[in-house]
């Protein structure tokens, strides 16, 4: 898999309790095929955070990678926006 063909997603960190792992909530919008209304879909991804820089509430960018564990297929690219606490 080429580096530029990997999926890159932007989402919000909802959990950082695991060691070197964050849970990222990614929200997407799709048009309903019949009613043509925009419907919001959300999905959680587990991502590898080697330096443990991401905290809850941060907006982050994650990239698809080889499987790192049973459920972890993404890694943290960068923190786009820090959470305001």
From Swiss-Prot:
Annotated GO molecular function terms are: rRNA binding; structural constituent of ribosome
| Name used for this protein in its record | Small ribosomal subunit protein uS17
> What keywords are annotated for this sequence in UniProt?
Ribonucleoprotein, Ribosomal protein, RNA-binding, rRNA-binding
UniProt similarity note: Belongs to the universal ribosomal protein uS17 family.
The record lists the organism as: Mesoplasma florum (strain ATCC 33453 / NBRC 100688 / NCTC 11704 / L1)
Under InterPro entries, the record lists: NA-bd_OB-fold, Ribosomal_uS17, Ribosomal_uS17_bact/chlr, Ribosomal_uS17_CS
Q: Name one GO biological process term.
A: translation
Tell me which GO cellular component terms the UniProt record holds.
cytosolic small ribosomal subunit
């Amino acid at each position: 898999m080429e580096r530029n063909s990997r999926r890159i997603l932007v989402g919000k960190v909802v959990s950082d309790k695991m060691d070197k792992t964050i849970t990222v909530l990614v929200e997407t919008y799709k048009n309903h095929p019949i009613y043509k209304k925009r419907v919001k879909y959300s999905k959680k991804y587990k991502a590898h955070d080697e330096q443990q820089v991401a905290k809850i509430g941060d907006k982050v960018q994650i990239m698809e990678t080889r499987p790192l564990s049973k459920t972890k297929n993404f890694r943290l690219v960068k923190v786009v926006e820090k959470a305001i606490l």
